[in-house]
């Protein structure tokens, strides 16, 4: 009986000692969570470029190298993409055109060079097409699109193009920047 009583006293004392430690762990703590960068731009133009169009990735499907068997051959599988404009005011400008820049292929001027690096397909580049469906060389202004008040989508597309005979399989990547011209 004396042992039971002693065990109960020890257990009570231990519980009393542990309980404050448990409550101490529940106190408030502040830790560094990270950094958020905010970027934007104020423009004096007819429209603003939507956030989703400012930095986008256009995923192109696979194409067989046999479709790109001669210099200048395209896959015939254009991939569409748009540059979306918001808050357009046609009292400021009625038309918009786009100019793309990027690393030009060294053997075929006007097209985007394949910059995929390790594992890259060879003898292939990317050809841009304007809103009118015609080829759009780098640094060439696209055909103009007539704006409406509010939101507008400027349609473009891109296709694989052979820059030499003997296209080899591999990855294809390129980066283009664009600027808008309002008139």
Model-derived regions, located:
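Bacterial N-terminal signal peptides
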Residues: 9-17
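Mature extracellular/passenger domains of Gram-negative fimbrial/pilin and adhesin proteins
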Residues: 2-8, 20-183
């Amino acid at each position: 009986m004396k042992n039971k009583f002693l065990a109960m006293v020890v257990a009570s004392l231990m519980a009393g000692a542990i309980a404050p430690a448990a409550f101490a762990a529940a106190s408030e703590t502040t830790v560094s969570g990270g950094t958020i960068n905010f970027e934007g731009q104020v423009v004096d133009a007819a429209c603003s470029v939507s956030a989703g169009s400012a930095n986008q990735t256009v995923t192109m499907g696979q194409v067989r190298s046999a479709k790109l068997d001669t210099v200048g051959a395209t896959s015939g599988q254009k991939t569409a993409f748009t540059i979306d404009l918001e808050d357009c005011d046609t009292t400021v400008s009625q038309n918009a055109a786009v100019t793309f820049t990027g690393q030009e292929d060294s053997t075929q001027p006007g097209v985007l060079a394949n910059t995929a690096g390790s594992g890259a397909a060879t003898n292939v580049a990317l050809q841009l097409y304007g809103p009118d469906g015609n080829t759009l060389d780098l640094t060439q202004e696209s055909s103009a699109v007539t704006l409406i008040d509010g939101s507008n989508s400027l349609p473009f597309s891109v296709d694989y193009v052979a820059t030499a005979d003997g296209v080899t399989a591999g990855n294809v990547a390129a980066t283009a920047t664009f600027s808008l011209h309002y008139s």
